[in-house]
């Protein structure tokens, strides 16, 4: 019996997504409106652009829902997408100006996009396509089906070279935050490919151990020496702020320290939506990476925990769906 398309809609994933998106729009307006009014510009400017991206996300969801799965499995299709993404990444690195010390943004008629964000989706799509075609080999040969007993692949068309190439472009932005997320995404996709879980545990242990050694090495070597390494000079100050943001309140630690102040102001129940103190100019770029500190300041620990709970629901239902499909 042929199932109707609506049977494939998972409302347990869709509803938390919609709620989080609407909450995000409210928070963006709350975070940006006051400062916009002070500057004499429209308080709705940021929420309009974010609203457009929200609508585009719904259009994308509808497109993926309507498109035939076989089309997504075509090598030519994903190949064209990867080529287009590579061009966007290279343009954002070598043609555009820096934003807060790093490249990575492209502007089109008043809108800015960050190609590295789209790479996260493309990477999942690409690895899912590669691993889905190796399922019989994985069942028979485990992880060897992915590596062919070559830790350094000899074939330039090997999927590992493609992943390393794409992540390397992000690293030279430099954008180590997104590069780390892409590396973790690759690790998760490998673990979900069907290989024995002991290999995932080993990879995770190596990753955690390597990250710990790297952080302590940077601390021992010193941030100044680390900053002389090509590409990584940009992140040197961030490591310094990570260790103690209050040592340099006027420069590298300013944003992080003020995010701590914002969270401290919030307490259990917050100052109330729209009543943040730090967003009045004390916390730079409050609507970007540090927006959650404003959420805690306005909604408190309880409100922020409810939002995190929605993220957990979204993750758990998504992971449950993955397990169901594997079985």
List each model region and its residues.
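Hydrophobic alpha-helical transmembrane segments of multi-pass inner membrane proteins, especially
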Residues: 18, 39-251, 293-327
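Juxtamembrane/transmembrane-helix boundary motifs at the membrane-water interface
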Residues: 34-38
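A juxtamembrane structural motif centered on a specific transmembrane helix
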Residues: 1-3, 28, 134
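Long extracytoplasmic/lumenal interhelical loops at the membrane interface
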Residues: 260-302, 319-322
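Helix-boundary and loop/linker segments of multi-pass membrane transporters
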Residues: 5-7, 151, 155-156, 280-283
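N-terminal membrane topogenic signal
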Residues: 1-17, 155
